[in-house]
Amino acid sequence: LPLFETFSASNALASRGATPLKRLGCFYFPDGVPMPLREDPAHKDWAWFPHGNGRNFNFTKCMDPLEPLRNELTVISGLSHTAGRNVHGHNNADQFLTAAATGSGDRVYKNSISLDQLYARHVGDQTRFASLVMSTDGGTGTVRGAHTISYDRNGRAIPAENRPKRIFDMLFVKNDVDATRRLAHSQSALDELLADAQQLRKRLSSHDQNSLDEYLHSVREAEIRVQKAKQWINTPLPSVNADRMNLEITPDQPRLYLQTMFELIYLAFKTDSTRVATYQIGRENGVGISDHLSRAIG
């Protein structure tokens, strides 16, 4: 991403040496890309993939804004989500980063961990936030109508945040003085819940024990988040200048909204608040507030 003049962020990399940090950003937009056939006159200007191979390629109008970065990027073609062919072509956002055979028709839905969360398991302990999960519609949506592209190790959808101010406050606004007390209370509540669950487990059938174990796994993940928050609570938050940002922006102003969301991701990376981010720009099937974003911004 380019350096946005909106921000004057402290350089988090200065204290970490000169070794570039590896970051992962995954972005999803719905409804496909233009793929005109070679005999179609539109193929020259509007084919999604550049013409040519290796370094000797030419962008079409789809990607020509990336021309200044051509020596720093790789466009990959020829890949396929084979498991996605078993479901409707506009119902597979939930497979975008998991590539899981989620089931179709009468088969029971089952997903798996997404690429971003797998990477976050390796680098997430080095930053305040293991990952940043965002979308335009927010939340999780429904099966085949996902509002998120991030899934935990059990294949459960991770709710996405779509409110710029909420994202900014989470990243850069200091917690109140009661934060330590609330974290201690959360830890105590989780400890009691785990103790009660172990007693309950002795009275359950094998099937119910499996269901309880899945639930307890979520509780343990919450416990890990609480422990991590306690470790970072005395670490100062990055200092940023967002005076020129409109954090109350909504998708009703799509161009500014998208710019703001991408600027937040840039700033999260720049300050090393996280090294993993996902953003579902819109959802499939013409449902939700993001349906007309591309049309609105031209």
Predicted regions and their residues:
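Ligand-binding pockets and gating/stacking loops
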Residues: 1-298
